[in-house]
Curated annotation (Swiss-Prot):
GO cellular component, one term: cytoplasm
GO term, biological process aspect, one: chaperone-mediated protein complex assembly
Function: Involved in 20S proteasome assembly, facilitating the alpha-ring formation. Involved in maintenance of telomere length.
Protein name as it appears in the record: Proteasome chaperone 4
Similarity comment: Belongs to the PSMG4 family.
Length: 148
């Protein structure tokens, strides 16, 4: 079970409109086994002057269904099952982690863990405005690293 861990800071192209993201990803080094999960830790970049550290806000797990075992699945439905391993009272954070894990698991056909980390003082409303931006940037990073 060979994995590689990468750490990236994803800068915004438009400056202040989208936040800078910190992403740590653990990816399979060998793409033959579809059982090795993709793991992401994602959060907004924190200023170096802040002395408080980010904390775990939500931890979500998603796994693709075996298509040959579930022939009766309706087309158009999700082929991924997921569950929060650590839930949060904030729906915005949970939805972000759930969408990321589900989309990544379906796109790369392997299990996926997504961790969202944030400061206690962080405003989760930033997630609503930047939901698609965060998804796109994380998917682009994974496509590049996994060679797809």
């Amino acid at each position: 079970m060979l994995v590689k861990t990468i750490s990236r800071t994803i800068e915004s192209e438009s400056g202040f409109l989208q936040p800078t993201l910190d992403v740590i990803a653990t990816l399979p080094a060998d793409d033959r086994s579809k059982k090795i999960p993709i793991s992401l830790v994602v959060g907004f970049k924190q200023e170096a002057s802040l002395n408080s550290s980010s904390s775990l806000s939500c931890y979500y797990y998603a796994i693709p269904l075996m298509r040959d075992r579930h022939i009766n699945l309706k087309s158009g439905g999700s082929n991924v099952v997921g569950i929060p391993l650590l839930d949060t009272k904030d729906d915005r954070i949970r939805d972000m982690a759930r969408h990321m894990a589900t989309i990544i698991s379906e796109r790369f056909n392997r299990p996926c863990y997504v961790t969202w980390s944030s400061l206690p003082s962080e405003d989760p409303s930033m997630l609503v405005a930047n939901h698609l931006y965060i998804l796109k940037k994380c998917l682009d990073l994974l496509k590049t690293e996994l060679g797809e």
